A protein has these predicted regions:
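Rossmann-like adenosine-cofactor binding region
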Residues: 164-258
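N-terminal Rossmann-fold NAD(P) dinucleotide-binding loop
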Residues: 143-144
Length: 309
């Protein structure tokens, strides 16, 4: 369920001779056509419940996202449906986007653009990333990719993850239980957690209060991991210096949302992964799994439905 090109659709269908591959723009548009479907691919934030109710034959669901939050319905949990995701596909594009946001903030690029539009020659004084401490909360493949790129700027990388392990691109690794102790050490806090029941509102008033007043908060993961009202409050009160955001609790962002007018917020409209390379990698993964599925072989990126990732 996505706008795939005719070329990509043909590639998928040709990979499994005798198969039928159809694409629809939305779950609502697809609903009348899924009764005989064996597999469905859609975004992890789309509502799958009506589709599964109308598709008794489905044995495999693939999330075009890393996240699968809205796919874990009662029927999904109860039926023997294999669930896979697009883990690893987004790493390069999302990590590059994160660095773009971070550098834009540090070098005050949005302010320079506003001055350009106003025809004003003002020279805002930016900062260097050199020597800064970056805390990455959620150190999966995207978190590691961000760390790898940030290390080029000679930064110190702190990682928070569920279980301790040695990490090539992290100077120190902490558990989630140690988050409150490590937050005050960071100049930049990057949220890279999956969306699960355990991570809902993971960043709230207490977490923002524990950060430096000069800290920058970046969320390129999922909106559900942040208490958005608490973030707005922290930004308005100056508890933190600013935020760079690619995900929001409601998308498109409502016209009256406070973020629109906040000069200490840089926003992008959920575009961190939207580059041509992403689509090529995504369809390659989908094609590999489609072939494996048709042969009864093990699928890549199978999700533990109980854990949610």
């Amino acid at each position: 369920i996505n706008k795939l090109s005719e070329e990509k659709l043909a590639e998928l269908q040709n990979a499994v001779p005798g198969s039928v591959v159809e694409a629809y723009k939305s779950p609502k548009e697809a609903l009348p056509h899924v009764s005989d479907a064996d597999a469905i691919a859609l975004w992890g934030f789309q509502d799958i419940a009506p589709l599964l109710a109308a598709a008794p034959r489905v044995r495999w669901v693939h999330s075009l996202s890393d996240g699968v939050e809205r796919l874990l319905t009662k029927e999904m949990m109860e039926r023997p449906i294999i669930l896979t995701n697009s883990h690893g596909v987004h790493d390069r594009s999302v990590s590059e986007h994160t660095m773009a946001l971070l550098l834009s903030w540090m070098r005050r690029i949005p302010e320079a653009v506003r001055n350009q539009e106003a025809g004003e020659w003002i020279r805002p004084r930016g900062e260097s990333l050199f020597g800064k401490t970056i805390l990455i909360v959620g150190f999966g493949s995207i978190g590691r990719a961000i760390a790898q790129r940030a290390k080029v700027f000679e930064t110190k990388i702190l990682a928070v993850k569920k279980h301790l392990s040695t990490e090539l691109f992290a100077d120190h690794v902490y558990t989630q239980e140690e988050l409150m102790d490590v937050l005050p050490k960071a100049d930049i806090v990057i949220a890279a957690l999956p969306s699960t029941p355990d991570t809902e509102n993971f960043f709230g008033a207490d977490q923002f209060a524990a950060m430096k007043k000069t800290a920058l908060f970046i969320n390129i993961a999922r909106a559900s991991i942040v208490d958005e009202n608490a973030l707005i409050d922290a930004l308005e009160k100056g508890s933190i210096a600013g935020a760079c955001l690619d995900v929001f609790s409601k998308e498109p962002l409502p016209a009256d949302h406070p973020f629109w007018k906040m000069k200490n917020v840089i926003m992008t409209p959920h575009t961190a992964s939207m580059v041509p390379d992403f689509w090529n990698k995504l369809t390659a993964l989908l094609q590999t799994n489609f072939v494996n599925f048709s042969r009864g072989e093990k699928l890549m990126n199978e999700v533990d439905k109980k854990k949610g990732y």
